[in-house]
Swiss-Prot record:
Protein name: Glutamate-1-semialdehyde 2,1-aminomutase
Subunit structure comment from the entry: Homodimer.
Gene that this polypeptide is encoded by: hemL
Family assignment from sequence similarity: Belongs to the class-III pyridoxal-phosphate-dependent aminotransferase family. HemL subfamily.
Catalytic activity: (S)-4-amino-5-oxopentanoate = 5-aminolevulinate
């Protein structure tokens, strides 16, 4: 029995399913989840001392790679001054100033402790600002596990094959209108009929929870136009894409300005952090300035601010994102070449330093239906073959992959060598 197998058996005694987030259980790929004990640079090391090139990156935050010395040093220094104060700090203000300078749409920002908190709070704020109840989201897009958003969500909910979660009252779900991603005509039709009841449209500008589906040409532009026409707040959920697709996130990359944005993952440098913000007029409705209540004991805690500030400063250097994107492109090109050579139907998607892998004969992946038509069974086999070759991919056919600045030519070669063997075995 491996050390991971023993630990998983032990974990299941007191942790539901043996994990603290469902996708970690390997249910969609089979087998025993790996238990990691160390991570450094582009690598993770499991409890049986096997090293893997890591394309999960703690589900996105580790854009600098694991254990960047400057980030660790900033956290150590803050540790000497205490863990949390429950009071304002200079670092909170510095973080707010930096985020607002990087993301042009952000005129004001509020720190929270997770991406779920950020999206939940942004939607409450949009409802309070507009006085409307309904929200529009898109099929296969995941915005955290708050009740009103677990309707036809993506990620682990796709893996489980259910459209929503038990325990969500029907009265909550009735205010959530779910439309097809990348279908602006459906948005136009819905808003023409019920636009006066809709508080906000929330969208992942790159859908990262049905693997990685970039926006179709004109889709984000159409959302902006329709929201302006009907007085609807446009929210970009940039928990995944923020500071990764480009320094300014997907909104910077695609040139679309939302009214509100949510961030997580990278903004905390690996610590539990989220934030939401946007137009001053809307943010002025949040307590203590306005009637929309939001609070959190650990919001803006100094350890997270230290890690996040250091990370954002490091990734702001000129050329950082171009280097990341180039590695990702070279890796995906290499995978495609090896799949083609083996005669395996395979297509990749990319948005900066995030990517999707699909076992599909389609020319491109644009819709939820395209995603669901891909061969999840073949992905299972590929996942384990890549593990055998020392490469750790997301353990789900519906999760995006992530690269870091720590990935280089050595890691690229390990990845492509493992893939060549894997594709050959999948013929």
């Amino acid at each position: 029995m491996s050390r991971s197998e023993a630990l998983f058996a032990q974990a299941q005694k007191h942790i539901p399913g043996g994990v603290n987030s469902p996708v970690r259980a390997f249910k969609s790929v089979g087998g025993t989840p790996l238990f990691f004990k160390h991570a450094e640079g582009a690598y993770v090391v499991d409890e049986d001392d096997k090293r893997y090139v890591d394309y999960v990156g703690s589900w996105g935050p580790m854009i600098l790679g694991h254990g960047h010395p400057d980030v660790l040093d900033s956290v150590r220094k803050q540790l000497e001054h205490g863990l949390s104060y429950g009071a304002p700090t200079a670092m909170e203000t510095e973080m707010a100033d930096l985020v607002c300078s990087i993301v042009p749409s952000m005129e004001m920002v509020r720190m929270v402790s997770s991406g779920t908190e950020a999206t939940m709070s942004a939607i409450r704020l949009a409802r309070g600002y507009t006085g409307r109840d309904a929200i529009i989201k898109f099929e296969g897009c995941y915005h955290g596990h708050s009740d009103s958003l677990l309707v036809k969500a993506g990620s682990g909910l796709l893996t489980q094959g259910v459209p929503s979660s038990a325990g969500v009252p029907a009265d909550f779900a009735k205010h959530t209108l779910t439309l097809p991603f990348n279908d602006i005509a459906a948005v136009e039709k819905t808003l023409a009929e019920v636009g006066q009841t809709v508080a906000c449209i929330i969208v992942e500008p790159v859908a990262g929870n049905m693997n990685c589906v970039p926006p179709a040409p004109g889709f984000l532009e159409g959302l902006r136009e329709q929201c302006d026409k009907h007085g609807v707040v446009l929210i970009f959920d940039e928990v995944m894409t923020g500071f990764r697709v480009s320094l300014g996130g997907a909104q910077g990359h695609y040139g679309i300005t939302p009214d509100l944005s949510t961030f997580g993952k990278i903004v905390g440098g690996g610590m539990p952090v989220g934030c939401f913000g946007g137009k001053r007029e809307i943010m002025g409705c949040i307590a203590p300035l306005g009637p929309v209540y939001q609070a959190g004991t650990l919001s803006g805690n100094p350890l997270a601010m230290a890690a996040g500030l250091t990370t954002l400063k490091l990734i702001s250097r000129p050329g950082f994102h171009a280097e990341l994107t180039d590695y990702t492109s070279r890796m995906l090109d290499g995978l495609q070449q090896r799949a083609d050579a083996a005669g395996v139907p395979f297509v990749t998607t990319q948005a900066g330093a995030m990517f999707g892998l699909y076992f599909s004969g389609a020319d491109d992946i644009v819709t939820f239906e395209d995603v669901m038509a891909s061969d999840a069974e073949r992905f299972k086999r590929f996942f384990h073959l890549m593990l055998d070759g020392g490469v750790y991919l997301a353990p789900s056919a519906f999760e995006a992959g992530f690269t870091s600045i720590a990935h280089g030519d050595k890691e690229l070669q390990i990845t492509l060598d493992a893939a060549e063997k894997a594709f050959a075995a999948l013929k």
